[in-house]
């Protein structure tokens, strides 16, 4: 058996995770069309962020609230290789995440599917991040201020209590 370093293991698992996310969706699209595949993908993203958030809460001992969301979500984004900055906004715990390189959009572009990227981003990103927010408090709101897939230089997400 080959012994991989921790970094190699993470890289391997992340590559597999990324590939299966796109692969199953493409296979559903081949059989049922893009709209059905996008709807099913959206259903998956109504559940998957709950699993991620709950696991990070368990690993860190964090509970609910905007501060715990900030810590867990920025950790998740770092682990997934996002290029982003997070900043506090105001005194109520609100924060903004600015993503300057979106790997999912890049995959859509490199596979010749840029024209579909905004449809995916509009539906899936809205679902993913709102589910993340709800896992830390039912009153936490998320607003997508702009998105790369719609021609902006960055994606900007604002989370507020």
What are these regions (language model features)?
Residues 1-123, 134-154, 158-161:
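N-terminal accessory segment detector
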Residues 127-129:
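Mixed-charge, glycine-accented linear interaction segment located at domain edges/termini
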């Amino acid at each position: 058996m080959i012994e991989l370093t921790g970094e190699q293991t993470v890289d391997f698992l992340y590559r597999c995770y990324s590939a299966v996310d796109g692969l199953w969706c493409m296979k559903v699209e081949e059989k049922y069309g893009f709209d059905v595949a996008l709807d099913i993908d959206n259903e998956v993203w109504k559940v998957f962020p709950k699993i991620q958030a709950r696991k990070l809460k368990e690993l860190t001992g964090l509970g609910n609230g905007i501060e715990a969301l900030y810590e867990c979500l920025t950790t998740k984004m770092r682990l997934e290789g996002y290029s982003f900055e997070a900043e506090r906004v105001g005194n109520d715990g609100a924060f903004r995440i600015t993503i300057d390189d979106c790997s999912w959009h890049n995959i859509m572009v490199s596979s010749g599917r840029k024209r579909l990227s905004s449809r995916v981003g509009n539906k899936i990103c809205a679902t993913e991040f709102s589910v993340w927010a709800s896992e830390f408090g039912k009153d936490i709101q998320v607003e997508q201020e702009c998105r790369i897939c719609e021609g902006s230089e960055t994606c900007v997400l604002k989370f507020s209590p």
